[in-house]
């Protein structure tokens, strides 16, 4: 009998025309098999919008789908859905695996965004409401980030009009002019910042599973420490799932065929029973 396992993926961005996810039902093959599912942030955009009725509709659709068509599920918050639940991080495999959306590693949440300076300020203000002792904890940092994210309004993200969405997306991609450089710099900084977060807050964890940067991959970030990014359902990036059981962790690609998402090839496999963890990477 196969061991029970939890499946993790992130950054569906449902309701955003930038996402390839048009129908929630197309996720069903990904939900066939796991005993539990974790949606690791940015499942949709719940922030203030010029179209609140659209946000409410999308939110209702997601919650209904998760309740009726998925295994027991946990929705972890992200910077786009800071109020989707009160869960900001989870630990699996007796603390071996830390799961969080990933923006927690950045002081300004989304350093490539035109809102980065404002988010950094809001983050500092939110952290200041905690005691000095609390500010040193991961829980306080995550709560402060969600407060900050909830105050940043959407731009084009749930715009249903194709032309308006395209204009908004183009503007976001081109402004500020340094945006591409900021994205690349964030990619470069991510392994170092993720390693620092584990060292400070979860030194016993051997694997950090995140999304946020839309760059799927598996990377060693220290002696026996690994960073796994599940990518996104938004081109040109690809999405991955992470399956975690008591004995092992497996990273698999997500393939989209005829509008339906399915499990693809294995990218990496970790034996959590070994000390240190043994890792097999796909060629």
Kindly give the residue locations of the regions a language model identified.
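N-terminal short leaders/motifs
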Residues: 26-54, 157-165, 177-205
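Long, positively charged, glycine-interspersed low-complexity recognition regions
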Residues: 16, 56-59, 218, 227-283
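Active-site-proximal loop/helix segment associated with metal-binding centers of metalloenzymes
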Residues: 102-192
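Core catalytic region of metal-dependent phosphoesterases/phosphodiesterases
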Residues: 2-9, 14-96
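Flexible, glycine-rich phosphate/dinucleotide-binding loops
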Residues: 46, 82, 106, 236, ...
């Amino acid at each position: 009998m196969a061991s029970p396992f939890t499946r993790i993926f992130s950054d569906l961005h449902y309701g955003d025309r930038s996402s390839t996810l048009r129908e929630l039902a197309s996720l069903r093959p990904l939900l066939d098999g796991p005993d539990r599912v974790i949606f690791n942030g940015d499942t949709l955009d719940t922030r203030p919008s010029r179209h609140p009725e659209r946000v409410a509709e999308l939110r209702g659709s997601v919650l209904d789908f998760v309740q009726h068509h998925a295994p027991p599920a946990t929705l972890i918050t992200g910077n786009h859905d800071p109020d989707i639940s009160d869960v900001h991080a989870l630990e699996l495999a007796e603390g071996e695996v830390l799961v969080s959306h990933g923006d927690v590693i950045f002081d300004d949440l989304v350093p490539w965004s035109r809102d980065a300076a404002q988010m950094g300020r809001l983050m500092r203000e939110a952290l200041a409401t905690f005691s000095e002792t609390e500010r040193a904890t991961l829980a306080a940092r995550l709560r402060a980030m969600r407060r900050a994210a909830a105050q940043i309004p959407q731009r084009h993200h749930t715009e249903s009009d194709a032309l308006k969405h395209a204009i908004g997306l183009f503007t976001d991609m081109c402004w500020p002019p340094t945006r591409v450089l900021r994205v690349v710099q964030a990619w470069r900084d991510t392994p170092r910042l993720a390693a620092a977060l584990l060292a400070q807050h979860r030194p016993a964890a051997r694997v950090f599973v995140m999304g946020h940067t839309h760059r799927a991959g598996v990377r060693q970030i220290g002696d026996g420490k690994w960073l796994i990014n599940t990518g996104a359902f938004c081109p040109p990036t690809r999405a991955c799932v992470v399956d975690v059981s008591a004995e092992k962790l497996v990273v698999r690609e997500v393939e989209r065929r005829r509008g339906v998402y399915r499990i693809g090839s294995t990218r990496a496999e970790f034996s959590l029973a070994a000390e240190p963890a043994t890792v097999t990477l796909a060629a």
